[in-house]
Amino acid sequence: MDTSRKIIHIDMDAFYASVEQRDHPEFRGKPLIIGGDPNKRGVVATCSYEARKFGVHSAMPTRQAAKLCPNGIFIHGNMAHYVEVSNQIREIFSRYTDIIEPLSLDEAYLDVTENKKGMKSATMVAREIQQTIYQELGLTASAGVSFNKFIAKIASDFKKPAGITVVTPEEAEAFLEQIPVTKFYGVGKVTAEKLHRLGIETGADLKKWSEWDLIRELHKHGYHLYRHVRGRSNNIVNPHRDRKSVGKETTFEFNVLDSRVLEQSLMQFAKKVEERLIKLQKHGKTVVLKLRYSDFTTITKRLTLNEYTNDTSQIYQAAALLLRESYTGQDSIRLIGLTVTNLKPVYFENLRLEGL
């Protein structure tokens, strides 16, 4: 395990909402919710910390957010402006290193092992970047500093907002033992439920399990979780990263025959894929359905749409059509997956922020 890298994960604090509060004094100190009209279909893209005190969070339906926070201010937001500010932040990063891996508009990995300023301390680099962003742009960022990307990302969320958390190689395993497994990369709702049923709530619980037992229970997720909780993870920051597809799949605890259960899974996947596509500022044209039967036979079917989309309904309808054409109901399904590929950037004026 290489522990020599110095990696920073920078995560802007409530980015879209913070930009709006910076630019519009009337929003400051008030519960601001970006996600469109609460009387129409929509999902919260992000919200200010004032709104979060009421239980509002990203990916929540705007109608639910309005019930939790009746005095909330709802706006659609301005994606083109957020992109502009994100580029300004990226320029600040580039003063320290060219090894930058953006994850979205508001977060990125930086490898500062050999940085342009010749600074030996990654902690000092992170602190200086935070200060520069605040001084020049009037925005706050949180930072995680460690020797691999997985730990740095978890650490950046530890002291929000405007915090900095450093995890050295010597501290890594103890740090990870206290973290809820729901914070681990790749642990979604389904995996979290499986872990809960197994009595695994924290990294410490996870660490008690052997690699083989985790793989048996959780398949590939088990392999990755075994490595993550021991601080063994990818430490290569990739400045050329570009997502070619966005997808979601799950292995059922019990084999499934009921097509309605499969359709429900596809709807959940379509919502998650839409959320990821919008965060990446992309839309896609090809929907791919993956089915694995109880005998481990795997098929994939794809449908290319007439136009690009990042809309839940359109993605689901295409996937459901593929399911109806592919699945007879005679053999049980072990795994189902949905992927959108053939991606390209979204034009700002067409971005469906209100539908995140």
Curated annotation (Swiss-Prot):
Pfam families: IMS, IMS_C, IMS_HHH. It is found in: Cytoplasm. Keywords: Cytoplasm, DNA damage, DNA repair, DNA replication, DNA-binding, DNA-directed DNA polymerase, Magnesium, Metal-binding, Mutator protein, Nucleotidyltransferase, Transferase. Gene3D superfamilies: 3.30.70.270, 3.40.1170.60, 5' to 3' exonuclease, C-terminal subdomain, DNA polymerase, Y-family, little finger domain. GO terms for molecular function: damaged DNA binding; DNA-directed DNA polymerase activity; magnesium ion binding. Residues 1-188 form the UmuC domain. InterPro entries: DNA/RNA_pol_sf, DNA_pol_Y-fam_lit_finger_sf, DNA_pol_Y-fam_little_finger, DNA_polymerase-Y, DNApol_IV, PolY_HhH_motif, Rev_trsase/Diguanyl_cyclase, UmuC. The gene is dinB. Signal peptide: none annotated. Its EC number is 2.7.7.7. The record marks Y16 as: Substrate discrimination. It comes from the Bacteria. It catalyses: DNA(n) + a 2'-deoxyribonucleoside 5'-triphosphate = DNA(n+1) + diphosphate. This is DNA polymerase IV. One of its GO terms (biological process) is error-prone translesion synthesis. Its main location: cytoplasm. Its cofactor is Mg(2+). PANTHER family: DNA POLYMERASE KAPPA, DNA REPAIR POLYMERASE UMUC / TRANSFERASE FAMILY MEMBER. Poorly processive, error-prone DNA polymerase involved in untargeted mutagenesis. Copies undamaged DNA at stalled replication forks, which arise in vivo from mismatched or misaligned primer ends. These misaligned primers can be extended by PolIV. Exhibits no 3'-5' exonuclease (proofreading) activity. May be involved in translesional synthesis, in conjunction with the beta clamp from PolIII. The keyword Glycoprotein does not apply. GO terms for cellular component: cytosol.
